[in-house]
Amino acid sequence: MAASASASALQAERCLLVGVGAGPRRHRLPLRMPPPLHAPPALLLLPHRRRRRWPPAVRASPGEGGGGGGGGGGGGGLAGALEKRPVMSALTVVVMNMRVLEIGVVAWSLATAIIPAVAGFMPGLVLSRILVGIGEGVSPSAATDLIARSIPVQERSRAVAVVFGGLSFGSVLGLLFAPPIIQNLGWESVFYIFGLLGIIWCLGFQSLKEQQLRGNEDIQVIQDLGQSPSGSSDLISSSVSPKSSESSLGELMNSLKDVPWREFFKSKAVWAMIYAHFCGSWGHYTCLSWLPTFFSEELDLNLTEAAWVSVLPPLGSMIITSIAAPFADNLISNGVDTTKVRKICQTIAFLSPATFMMLSSVDLGVPPWEIVAFLTSGLALSSFALSGLYCTHQDISREYASILLGITNTVGAVPGIVGVALTGYLLDTTHSWSISLFAPSIFFYLTGTAVWLAFASSEPQEFSKSEPESS
């Protein structure tokens, strides 16, 4: 439930700002759409992901500073999360990840709830967005670490799909329920409600954690008696350990020093994940930020129609994810090499949107609803990445999965700032959707596919820290 309410809050923000699009074309805000995006119910409130942020700034005319400002205003929350992710992800390896997840959800839930109170006070508003960025920066990595340590590889795709699929579900809920809530209770109520949902989730999660800790103690008693139960008790112990929850600050700092950062960047597989995450995020953020404007301007849909069309990609993602995850797990269970499965899924996730964007960027003389169907299908099929890239961090290292996600997620946040702004600038300069929106995304999808097929690997890697050479 946690990821869903945060994704829903993003939709609420978008609903509040949708009326701005009624002005002249060059001063219109891109109508926001949620990440499909990014712990099972927790990420129902979190946009992965991703990453709730205000809609990009208005595309300025050349005399007002150029279109480059088109996305600059959207980077506040992203920038806050971006610079915190690698270090915050490292914390999840040392401090009990359930506790980190709770802290993250509490942080951005409270930060969301106080937005109405600080809306007219810029420093307070900026602080709230920073808190949202910090809270969201740790949540996906904490969830990833829990999956890596407690879910076997044959079930990993479904676990990731359930966790990160909450983002799409939350986006759909937000688009459906935010407008009537705003209409009947006022815009402030949306932020109060979604903040409260996060706190309620934390209370329920605390109860669940205590139950698991008690169960873990029972397992330990059985093991001490020499009656080790069959199954994955070792995995449970590694993810739910009272000792890990009591890590001191000194242990935390020492553990951060022990993280083999240099070894990460010596791995071709890690670099493949970094570039793939960047490429996927470029297409994701730029398309989902600007497609509603494209629907409105290029396909002559009115604002209401464009807003309703925006629910289709996350809805399609939910459907595709429910198919892709069992497909990947079944292949692995039947003996297909894990690396091959991850490459197949990620290739589908990249080539599908690239193909449909190519079809949408040329004049085929098809009606608008077919263009909408093309783009919706492509973006929905990109959810195969949850069984590709998003499982690979855990495949190659259970111990450092959360940090690896933090690294790739940091790079993946850059297109949300740079790509959205660049799209606005190119659109003002060229007046071409094909050049400004589709061509860059197609380029990154194709090059991302090539790099992924060449260098990606799901083989477990030992990232032992290199000893300094003695003089």
Swiss-Prot record:
Q: At the top level of its lineage, which domain of life is listed?
A: Eukaryota
| Single GO MF annotation | transmembrane transporter activity
**Residues annotated as signal peptide:** none
Q: Which terms in the GO cellular component ontology are assigned?
A: chloroplast membrane
Q: Where is the composition biased (Low complexity)?
A: 228-247
This protein's membrane topology, according to the annotation, is: Multi-pass membrane protein
Primary localisation category: plastid
Q: Region Disordered: what ranges?
A: 56-76, 226-247
Q: What residues form the membrane-spanning segments?
A: 62-82, 103-123, 162-182, 185-205, 270-290, 307-327, 348-368, 371-391, 403-423, 435-455
Targeting signal (transit peptide) range: 1-59
Instruction: Enumerate composition-biased segments (Gly residues).
Output: 63-76
Keyword Membrane appears in the UniProt entry? yes
- Carries keyword Signal? no
Keywords linked to the UniProt accession: Chloroplast, Ion transport, Membrane, Plastid, Transit peptide, Transmembrane, Transmembrane helix, Transport
Q: Where in the cell is it found?
A: Plastid, Chloroplast membrane
Q: Which GO terms describe its biological process?
A: monoatomic ion transport
Stated family:
Belongs to the major facilitator superfamily. Sodium/anion cotransporter (TC 2.A.1.14) family.
- Indicate what this protein is called per its UniProt record: Probable anion transporter 5, chloroplastic
Query: What species is this protein from?
Result: Oryza sativa subsp. japonica (Rice)
The encoding gene? PHT4;5
